[in-house]
Amino acid sequence: FTIGITKGRWNTLVTELQQFKDDCDSNQPLWRVLPEFVARHPSYERVGLRDLCAQIHAKYKEHDIARLTTEMYLSNMEPAMKPSEAFARMAHREIDRVPIDQLEGRITAMLVTPYPPGIPLLIPGERFNSTIVRYLKFARDFNHLFPGFETDIHGLVSESIAGGGTRYYVDCVKPSRTAGGG
């Protein structure tokens, strides 16, 4: 299925986009526009669609996500080992599950791919830099503020913690005793 590939699908897409715009312009309550979503996330029951869009936009603007997502793909990627070596280390369970706040300088054992755009950001064997860590911190904080609208990042592992909340990790190569880092 590809959106808008035929005239019929194109018309459906345009109709749905127009309906979304109308609902946004009139600030329809989310319980009316997305009833199944609100049933799963009742905290949005009294929120209007335009209000939610404005809150999400403000958070993206506050963190200059358009610039950050460009910078992270253009940032200096430091290969620390061959991808095959990182995979072998993972296969032999020579990995640590590292929290986001401790990732800078660590070597990923996983492919790290944010969606969108679905382009790999790091491949196994590359080091996390401060720009990538800043993006992952934003994603973690955004996910906490807007449950149900979580950022999808392949390679970022989430675990529920007792008492509510979520912690995020990436599997990294264990530091070698003889080499400089992991």
Where are these regions (language model features)?
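Non-catalytic terminal extensions of PLP-dependent enzymes
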Residues: 2-182
